[in-house]
Amino acid sequence: MNKRWFALLGCLLFCASLAAPAQNLDAVLTSMDRAAASFHSVQTDFNADMYQKVVNEHDYQKGTMYFRKQGDSIEMAANITDPDKKYVVFSNGVVSYYQPSINQVTEYNAGKNRAEVESYLVLGLGGGGHALTNSYDVQYAGMEQVQGVSAAKLALTPKSQRVHNMFQTITLWIDPARGVPVQQRFDEPSGDYRITKYSDIRINQKLPNDAFKLKTDSHTKVVKPNG
């Protein structure tokens, strides 16, 4: 899948020892399973650091993200407030990227990749724990302090070569008390990476009525690169 998907979804878009006790990993995955069983929605603030190795540059973003799961339907929205206002919405298999500065919406249809895109959206958040082992080799890498939370660090290595070509490793820092991530890191083979920290996480609370609607007007231009 084109990396552009994940650059957008990431806006959105919330390995140490092989000898670590197996029950620790199982306990973390079980807490994630419990959280997924009752998961309907989440609102969270985020801070993201996107690093490009070839130019040795960091791109920082912050804002608020929203997730909603109804049956098999998944929606996500990211309101980026800094450094520039931008908005991303994933709904009905379509990623819509709104740039108010040029009053333009760019739409990408996930098409046959919809299920895969949705699986990344709920990675560690509403997607369950033990289900991760179907697609990843999962290692428990101990506990680390992340924004005042003692979080369980899980290192995921994709089993699929195609996914591994995009992400060498994916690391999740899980709050074991709530079974949700407080930090995620996606490492690409090129040396590029994205780290996202989540704070003020509100689970299953009422979301704004317009959380998944772009605030466009009659003059907004819509571009569809892949039809």
Predicted regions: what they are:
Residues 16-24:
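Bacterial Sec-dependent signal peptides at the C-terminal "C-region" and cleavage site
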Residues 26-27, 129-139, 196:
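A short, amphipathic edge element
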Residues 9-17:
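Bacterial N-terminal signal peptides
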Residues 97-124:
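Acidic/charged, solvent-exposed loop-and-adjacent secondary-structure segments enriched in E/D, K/R, S/T
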Residues 22, 106, 121, 139-219, ...:
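Gly/Pro-enriched, hydrophobic low-complexity segments
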Residues 25-97:
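N-terminal mature ectodomain segment of secretory-pathway/periplasmic proteins
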Residues 81, 99-101, 185-188:
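Beta-turn initiation residues at beta-strand->coil junctions
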Residues 1-8:
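Bacterial N-terminal signal peptides that target proteins for export
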